[in-house]
Structure formats: structure tokens, C-alpha cells
Amino acid sequence: MTDLEIYRKRLERIEELLSELSEYSGRGAIIIVEGKRDVLSLKRLGIEGNFELATHQSLFNFSEKIARLGNEVVILTDWDRRGDILAIKLSGYFQSFGLKPELEIRNKLRLISQKEIKDVESLYTYVSKLRLKTGYCSKRDFQ
């Protein structure tokens, strides 16, 4: 497989995950991220919705507040050590409140991006770089 084919495949898989994330968002799911730059990156990729920052209060209280809303929850913390710990703790708290959070999108993004990026805030730049290398443009590029 050539580098171009590898980049195309990665971009295709990331676009599929972004589409899935957009579907969750459209159903009213709460997308949990670590910081404001994560939100900005996702919005630049065309993801709109209800974003919540998990880093400004006790995780237990945060999880309880979100669980009370009764919405689906997507955990999209960074895929570094701190983000891994945060995802595990949040997932445990949500499960104790009867919610099964979506973690697959995060896990797949981690695998696809390999060691090239480790955080959500870099996702927009990474996708833009892949689009440039493959000559691919999506309608989101022109919004």
C-alpha cells in the first residue's frame, strides 16, 4: 500500500467517525471533551451540538449532573495518559448512574491517528493535512 492509499484510508475512516459523531449529536447526545480548543476543533470539522467540559469540577458531580439529563453520552477525551484516566473514571461513574457512554469513537480515533496526534484539539489540523495530501475536499471545507 502506498503512502497516498494509507492517507486516503485513514481520512475515510476518520470522516466515517465524524459522521457517526454528528449523528449522535443530532440525537441530542452530550459530547464530553477536556477543553475549549477541543470544542473549537470539532466545530471546525462540522460537529455541532451539546459539548460539556469535564475538567472544571469534580468528576462524580459532573457525571451525576449529566446522567440526570438522560441523554446519550459520548466521551471524547484526549488519547494521552491523562485522557485515558479521565475516560475510564467518567465511564465508571456514568455506568454507576445507569448510563452506558459511547467510547468507541474515541478508541477508533486513537487507533487511526496512531502516534501522529494525541488530542482532540489537533484533529482538525490532522484531517486538513490528510485532505491536502490526498487531494480530497469535503463540503465542510467550504463552510
Swiss-Prot record:
Mg(2+) 1 binds at E34, D78. It comes from the Archaea. Mg(2+) 2 binds at D78, D80. One of its GO terms (molecular function) is metal ion binding. Its cofactor is Mg(2+). SMART domains: TOPRIM. Pfam families: Toprim. Belongs to the UPF0292 family. This is UPF0292 protein Mbar_A0484. The lineage of its organism: Archaea, Methanobacteriati, Methanobacteriota, Stenosarchaea group, Methanomicrobia.
